[in-house]
Amino acid sequence: NYKNLVISESAVIRLFVIATTVILLSIITGIVLSIRKAKKSNDKVWNVSSKRLVINFGIPLVTGGFFIVFLIEKEILSLVAPLTLLFYGLACVNASKYTLGDVRYLGITMIVLGLLSTWFLGYGLLFWALGFGVCHIVYGSMMYFKYDRN
């Protein structure tokens, strides 16, 4: 029950450190894999299209991140899980214009999961597992078999 949930300040700091670490490791992994792929195909990693991709992905994601931090500060915790899915989905849809069009479908799926998670408050971890776990595994597998498999 989110109404009776009390989180100590040290727990909030630990959760923030964990979340920041996961985000940074995800970004670093994405950059490393992009550099490797670009080198294999003799492409530039940083060009006009990649700059637009980062900007269009970053604006909704960073906005959502700040919004969620403000909600946590106000102890409105019930919306944290749904909003992470929702803003990530919006970022994917917004960035899909500058990358594979299939990213749009991942984004729409995340938006739907975020809205469902808002409707079914209290099941945020389940929706996180579906969105950030199952959907990414399925999406990654589909992209591998569609574009990268030799």
Regions found by a protein language model. Give the residues of each.
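Selected alpha-helical membrane-embedding segments in polytopic membrane proteins
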Residues: N1-G65, V69
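Phenylalanine-focused residue identity feature
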Residues: F16, F57, F66-F70, F87, ...
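Lipid-exposed faces of alpha-helical membrane segments in multi-pass integral membrane proteins
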Residues: T21-L25, T29, I59, T63, ...
